[in-house]
């Protein structure tokens, strides 16, 4: 069943498991919304929803086999400049360990589903809503960029442009969803009700300026 509606998927690292539970239930009911917008971890959920792979996001986020753990130790963090093993998550997982069904993903898009991943363009400081339905490698890079948290992960270059986590520029892209003019919008949040983001401390602001001083705020 394809419903003419938008669904917005907030990020939140492993809190995205909550989102995956909601999407798994929708897939079990064979219910698909026509326009999916994912941010950060939500981008990973979005593509798994379009590929109709029940349980895949959960398996990727909660890995029981230590051999496939994606958290870097201190030594690897210093060497890779990344808290997470992004090669594991966005290369080995989709190609070998938890194979991503790109053909089903592509067919879903051909049948009318629009699947967007939100990234932050580090040159402009603005959100970009990216769509890729033909190039598997590029889709993985877009998901990687959307999930690359500042300070904790390196920038990701796509077509010569550096990108970071989509949540920096548009963490809950409801306004973008409204522009699509669908009658209904479903929003899946991963924070507790009433959550308000705290202001950045002076120390953290200084750290950001040191790391990204040449880029827009």
Label for each model-derived stretch:
Residues 1-39, 47-217:
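Patatin-like phospholipase
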């Amino acid at each position: 069943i394809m419903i003419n509606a938008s669904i917005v998927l907030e990020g939140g690292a492993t809190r995205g498991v909550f989102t995956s539970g909601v999407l798994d239930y929708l897939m079990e009911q064979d219910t698909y919304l026509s326009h999916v917008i994912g941010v950060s971890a939500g981008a990973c959920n979005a593509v798994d929803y379009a590929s109709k792979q029940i349980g895949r996001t959960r398996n990727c986020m909660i890995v029981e086999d230590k051999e496939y753990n994606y958290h870097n130790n201190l030594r690897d963090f210093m060497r890779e400049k990344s808290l997470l093993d992004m090669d594991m998550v966005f290369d080995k997982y989709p190609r070998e360990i938890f194979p991503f069904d790109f053909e089903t993903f592509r067919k879903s898009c051909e049948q009318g589903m629009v699947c967007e991943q939100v990234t932050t363009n580090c040159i402009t400081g603005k959100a970009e809503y990216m769509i890729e339905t033909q190039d598997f490698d590029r889709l993985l890079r877009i998901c990687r960029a959307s999930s690359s948290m500042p300070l904790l992960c390196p920038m990701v270059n796509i077509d010569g442009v550096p990108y970071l986590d989509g949540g920096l520029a548009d963490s809950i892209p409801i306004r973008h969803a409204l522009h699509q003019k669908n009658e209904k919008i479903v929003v899946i949040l991963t924070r507790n009700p009433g959550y308000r983001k705290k202001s950045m401390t002076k120390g953290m602001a200084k750290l950001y300026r040191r790391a990204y001083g040449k880029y827009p705020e």
